[in-house]
């Protein structure tokens, strides 16, 4: 994920945004050479050749050295989940703004600690909820808000991929990663929250590696369902889809299609033209706008990450109990 953020910052600079990558920190010396180590389940736009020039970008095996640099204003935390809160807090105490990868943490208490530190230091700390910025998904939020096709009456989200083979065993240790429930499915839980607010209850079936949840959302008369999972076959292609029914249209997104977003109305089916950028570009450009004063509040605030964490924990409780579980307010 670090290389994905790096490439997005570089594209932002190339497009004229007031930013420049000045430093990289990693405990692995091989990653400080600037050479690519490709991994992941989606094309993030990161290049497969040299990622950065170490003669132009400072490199630090010790993150505290990076945080002590006056040249650094914004830090992307792209590490294992268990380190997110500690590193984000250290960055804010050093006077830096923070973009922290998802999931922010696996507990409500950890997210609350981070919120308090952001309030105390006055620093920006934004969770990297990239789907809020993803072309076709930001469009969906706009249509929901404007009611251009009426209100949403049902929604189904699907996010499936091969089980991660990278990460040195981190992802297969569900006590550390939270499994696909926390690490992959979080995207759709966040988007359900983004569209409908906090669900009152959830009913989850499956396993921590592959699950399906029905969300009780008071504003939606029909079902709101999200399926997410890491599948056993390494050759399985990544799948990211939604079908959302409005009163006067159906929106159908499938990242695997040449035309990912289609809208079906009473009289026609049409393609919706989307931006060539991706959600990583969007979240990073928004973070830059926040730091430079061109935006005044995060589109993905930490308070939302707290609510999403509560929803995911309710899903885990439902999974264990075998019946619907209310979401703590």
Give residue spans per PLM region.
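Contiguous beta-strand/loop segments that form the cofactor/metal-binding neighborhood of enzyme cores
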Residues: 183, 189-258, 284-295, 328
């Amino acid at each position: 994920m670090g290389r994905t953020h790096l490439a997005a910052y570089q594209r932002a600079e190339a497009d004229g945004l007031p930013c420049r990558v000045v430093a990289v920190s990693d405990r692995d010396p091989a990653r400080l050479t600037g050479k690519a180590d490709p991994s992941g389940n989606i094309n993030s736009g990161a290049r497969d050749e040299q990622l950065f020039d170490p003669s132009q970008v400072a490199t630090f095996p010790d993150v505290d050295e990076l945080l002590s640099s006056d040249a650094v204003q914004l830090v992307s935390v792209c590490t294992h989940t268990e380190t997110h809160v500690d590193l984000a807090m250290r960055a804010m105490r050093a006077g830096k703004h923070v973009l922290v990868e998802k999931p922010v943490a696996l507990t409500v208490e950890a997210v609350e600690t981070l919120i308090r530190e952001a309030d105390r230091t006055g620093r920006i700390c934004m969770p990297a909820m990239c789907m809020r910025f993803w072309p076709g998904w930001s469009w969906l939020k706009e249509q929901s808000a404007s009611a251009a096709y009426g209100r949403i009456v049902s929604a189904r989200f699907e996010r499936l991929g091969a089980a991660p083979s990278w990460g040195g065993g981190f992802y297969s240790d569900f006590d550390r990663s939270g499994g696909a429930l926390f690490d992959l499915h979080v995207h759709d839980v966040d988007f359900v929250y983004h569209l409908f607010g906090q669900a009152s209850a959830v009913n989850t079936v499956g396993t921590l590696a592959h699950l399906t949840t029905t969300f009780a959302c008071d504003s939606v008369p029909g079902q709101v369902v999200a399926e997410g999972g890491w599948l056993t076959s390494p050759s399985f292609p990544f799948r990211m889809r939604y079908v959302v029914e409005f009163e006067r249209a159906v929106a159908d997104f499938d990242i695997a299609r040449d035309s990912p977003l289609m809208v079906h109305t009473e009289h026609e089916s049409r393609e919706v033209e989307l931006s060539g950028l991706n959600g990583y570009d969007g979240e990073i450009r928004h973070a830059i706008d926040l730091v430079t004063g061109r935006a005044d509040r995060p589109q993905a605030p930490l308070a939302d990450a707290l609510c999403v964490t509560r929803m995911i924990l309710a899903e885990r409780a439902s999974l264990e109990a075998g019946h619907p579980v209310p979401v703590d307010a």
